[in-house]
Amino acid sequence: MLTVHHLNNSRSQRVLWLLEELGVAYEIVRYQRQPDMRAPAELRAIHPLGKSPVITDDGNTIAESGAIAEYIIDTYGNGRLIPPPKTPERLSYTYWLHYAEGSAMPPLLLKLLFTLMPKRAPALLRPLVRKVSNQALTTLVNPQLKQHMAFWEGELSKSEWFTGNEFTAADIQMSFPLEAAAARGGLDQGHPRAMAFLDRIHARPAYRRALERGGPYSVGR
């Protein structure tokens, strides 16, 4: 049976959700973040990088969110949650499936990093670290985030979902960046369509079932 190596408050929540949408049976092995929010060393026994998400299935170990989504759709989807091949929607699907981690998440991770750095710096260095962090946020990170959030808002003005009128696995993939942006990027300020997207996904029965299976989930808080 497919096994999800599930780290709390992590991208692996999307994997549970995708499996619930498809009705795939799976087992969960749970891992808790350490006090510094890092994944525990036990995950390295599953994959050398010790990162989440990771799944094991039929003798295969698959890491990386996009690769996992593709594997699950190819293996268990039976044409569901993916547009037909050789259509504009399929091209859009592929783009968003990989954009989520390749382009959307880096500025959100930098936002988290530069926000946490002053809090974790030694007391004597804290004023300097805060100054450097604020400068990086102001000149580099926040402008990038605003650009991405405006991009999402514009795309979601065309249709309810990122690939068109049908919900797909690409929307599941995009959920994490939007949830992170709502938590710490200001998405709730002037991006009503993006926030409505979050309302729609949070209301899906499979999303709620994934929360019940995975446990408490809070992105970037």
Where on the chain are the PLM-derived regions?
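GST-like domain detector, emphasizing the conserved glutathione-binding G-site
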Residues: M1-Q135
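Short, solvent-exposed turn/loop segments enriched in Gly/Ser/Thr/Pro and often Arg
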Residues: Q32, A169, G214
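Generic structural signal for helix capping and beta-alpha/helix-loop junctions
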Residues: D36, S218-V219
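Residue-level recognition of oxygen-bearing side chains
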Residues: A67, R193, A206
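Short, hydrophobic secondary-structure boundary micro-motifs
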Residues: G79-P84, P106-L108, W161-N165, Q189-G190, ...
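GST-like fold's C-terminal all-alpha helical module
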Residues: A100-D199, A203
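A short, acidic, flexible beta-alpha connecting loop/helix-capping segment that sits on the rim
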Residues: R204, G214-Y217
